[in-house]
Amino acid sequence: AITLVMDGKELTVEDGKTLLDVAREMGKDVPTICYHDATTANGLCRMCVVEVEGQRALQPACVVQAGAGMKVHTRSEKVIRARKTILEMLDSTMDLSEADEIQTMMKDYNTDANRFPDAERRESEIKDDNPMYIRDYSKCLLCWRCVQVCAEDAQYTYAINFEGRGFETQIGTFFDKTIPETTCVLCGQCVAVCPTGALKPRREYLLQQGMSPQEISVLNTGRKKRKAR
């Protein structure tokens, strides 16, 4: 066991826990975006950063282990400023209209939607190439959750991965194949962990587009017949 101080409170915890684990055990509201209980923590989004005295940079709580003697601040002015900036940058570059948890975070941190007015927004055509789900990468914030559950964290299918570099980075299939041409088994786990609606059940998407359940059934039947030929 180790002893540390978090937000002024001294506590003893089991060795091997992350700072996020400790914070949650204390009931602290440390926000996360890329982190999910079903995936391996990777520290990509940096929303869970906390301030550790003696460390110059803020530390991602999801991957940094609690250490003996640490003095941690989960909501200092520096932490709040960093989280707010991350949210404002995300909001200025992509469509977060269906990201309910992130919308709640933006209200909590009182973000300014106009802070980065000249930011280039991520644009992408909706990919509707399979009967299970659609892919709208204009809503994708590259949290990596879908890639992880498609790979070692759950399915071991490896149908999707990162492609491109810098601002052009996006989630895609190898050689830009359609989903039916990949190793995807349509398990739906990627859709389940997506925090923004970038991956969405196809039926839900078509209903939002104004189609009736009957029209969707006819559409799916036609797709199955074409596939059988």
Predicted regions and their residues:
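Short glycine-rich loop/turn motifs that provide flexible caps or phosphate-binding loops at active sites
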Residues: 7, 15, 42, 163-165, ...
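Fe-S ferredoxin-like electron-transfer domains
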Residues: 46, 55-183, 192, 197-229
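N-terminal cofactor/phosphate-binding cores enriched in small/glycine residues
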Residues: 11-68
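Residue-level recognition of oxygen-bearing side chains
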Residues: 18, 145, 189
